[in-house]
Each structure stands twice: as C-alpha cells, then as structure tokens.
C-alpha cells in the first residue's frame, strides 16, 4: 500500500463521523422523484437527463446546497457545483467530491445519488461540528452521466474537464429528438460559469460498485485503481428481406442471422481474451421484425472493455476483421460507427493509498480494484489527482430498482469519504501536480446528424449502406 504519513489527521478530526440517518433520509427523499417500482415492489427512479424529473431533482439538491450555505455555481453544460469556503477565505483549489443524479429508465436509489448526497452530508457534518478546513470543499453533480437520453455518457464531466466543448454538446440530439442546448435552457440550467471548469486540488467519488466482486469476496469496500477503457460501436447490417418459407437457406442474405453471429463472436472473443476483458451486445433491432420474413436490416450495439489499452485495441482489430469476413460470406453490408471510445484511466496512487489506509483505519476490509463501469471520476482524472471508493452492491445488481447496498455500508462509505477529504484538505503535501494524460480518443453521438460512418464492411470504397437506420434508433443508449 502506497501511503504518505503526511495524510495522518489529528485526533480532533480523525474521529469525526457523519449523521447516518440524515444521509439515508436524503437518499430516500431524492428517490421519490421520478418514482418507479421493481418487479417485487422495490423503489426506484427514472430521471433521464434534462427531463422534467431531472429538473425537479436538480431543484431539490440545489436547494439543499443553498440551505447549507454553499456558493452554488451552474456552468455552461448544467453541472452544479456547491463550494464551502475555507477557514481563512482561501481561494485555493477545492477538494471536490460528487457524482450524478440522472438515471437510466430503470434506475435504483443509489447509483450516483450516494456520491452527491454523501458530499452534502459531509458539509453538514463539518458545519455541525463547527470545523473549517484549510482548503475549500466542493460538492458537484454532473449532467448526463448515464447517457440514457443523450450520447456520450459522462457528458457533463467530459465538458467540465475540456474533453468536449459546450457548443458541441449543445448540438447533440437525444433519443426523443431533443437537443441538449434546448433542453438545458428549457429546464433553466443553461448556466454561465464557463467550461472547462476549475481544476480541483483532488477529486474523490463515492459510488456503489455496480458489480458482484466485493460481495462475492466478502470484502466491504474497494479502493478503485482506475476505470476500464470503453469501446462502443453501433452496427447497421443491411441484407435482403425475403419470404421465410420459400427462400432457400443458401440463397439468403439474412441481417438477423448476421447479427446473431456477431453477438456470439463478441462473447467468444471475451472468453478467449480472458479476465478482465468483457464484451456485450446490449441492443438488437430487426426490420421488418416479422415472424415470416427474413430480416432486411439489423441495428445492434457492441460494447468492449478492458483495463489495458493494447488489449482493447487488439480486440477491436479482431472484431473488425471478423465483421468484414462475415459481411462478405453472407452477402450483406455492415456499416459501423463509433458511439464512444475512452482509453483506460489510472487513478492517482497517492489518493488510492489514502483511500486504502482510511478503509483499514476505520476497521473495514478492503481491496484495490478497477471499475468496470464508467464514472465522472475518470473525466476529472484528466485535470487533478483522483480516486474512488466502492461500496458493495447486493448480487451486483444496478440500473434496476432492486439495486441495494446495506444502509450501514452507505453510512460507513460516507465516513470514509469524509476522512479522505479531510486528509486531502488539511495536509501541505503538494498533490496538485500535473496528472498523467488521459486520452479521450473518440466521442460521437448515436442519434445526431453528426455521426460519421467509420467503417463499412462489404461495401466498395466510396460506397454506402442502403440501410435506413433512422427507423431503428434504439430506445435508450446503454449507460456506462
């Protein structure tokens, strides 16, 4: 474990703990906005980014920020930042925490919400104890982390750190035809604070794991070392519609069969490449989608992830080669476009070590682990030292009202975050050195007119697919 003992806090701060009941009450209250129920009656939320439900949640959380005396800023992409002043009015860069409050259509109560509301609870805990910190403390929630309505996901934090301009983001068109810029204005969150935003002294995000590893291994918390690289593609397969009964198998150009072959290859490739590589086909739409008609077109998404950039790139190469060969053998055309492409992100070893040390100091089991999901923290790592804390997720379930983390773990997670933020704020260690570069290779938008076809299999150079995928737009992009 890499731990600098200059992070050690005095006893007056090392014993400080949050008010658990207050945190849990805020989580439940926020969860009542956009309410849905799981199949067994579990409470969940549906708050797609920049919808009326998102606006209501923003108003609630922003009101809580103001009640706590935070200086609230809304930036050009609708990110909201609440800042607590330092002891001497210092204008030093703040120690920041935060996450997101938008959800997928089938959201639970904790994804994102925990990180934001734990930050507010930390502010209230400091206020109640009449403790002022050497550096400002900041709590943020970022716009459109999920990518469920607008692509790319993590849009707000991407714009905040300069990986995408606000003007480019404004022109993204969502699954319902709405523009990001128009919707920001409509809900009243087209802010004036410029982007890119201020670089924090450090950023730490508390989040549920959204996976089964911690629970399966009987470990309470994770010290997150980084985030897997992500490669998202959308494929449009154009074959030939024909009669299901009269067309011999040897004479078919079946888009549905081709999609099935691709889905099988994605799984086989992941198994062959081994852990931690994963591959997923999350969406398939067939046209005309009739029981007695060979499918003319298929639109599908492919999600490849790995913690090693070289391996991820190799998986993309092998996938592209397979798709080209398959298109030729089946007599179909396959057009692909990139939805998002992020390199793996390594978090700051000093902050990871601090998280590990704090987990152990407060009497908990912990482990170093990468994140399989994308998070706002990976964007903030572009501009400051960053790490994350993971709590257990029961059965690994997330993006589902059945998402559950033990209340005691939610509370302890917030205590860990409090102690880590205090250590970062109160020490003189020069932690704000330039972080390692984090390349965002490609981000294109799944539903806007600016999406470029990046590869076409089975079509001569200069050709184009005759598939009309406008009718096959997925209902909801997979959230990171």
Question: Which role fits each region the language model picked out?
Answer:
Residues 23-26, 33-36, 98-99, 366-416, ...:
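Zn-dependent metallopeptidase/amidohydrolase metal-coordination segment
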Residues 5, 56, 225, 243, ...:
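His/Asp/Glu-rich mid-to-C-terminal helical/loop segments that flank catalytic regions of hydrolases
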Residues 62-66, 71, 75, 79-181, ...:
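Active-site metal-coordination/substrate-binding segment of hydrolases
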Residues 7-10, 17-108:
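Acidic/His- and Gly-rich active-site-bordering loop/insert found
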Residues 45-50, 282-289, 301, 307, ...:
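A short beta-alpha structural unit
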Residues 10, 144-145, 149-310:
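Midchain, well-structured core segments that form catalytic/ion-binding scaffolds
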Residues 17-20, 32, 36, 177-225, ...:
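Active-site-adjacent substrate-binding region
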Residues 97, 106-146, 231-237, 243-269, ...:
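Alpha-helical metal-binding/catalytic segments enriched in His/Glu/Asp
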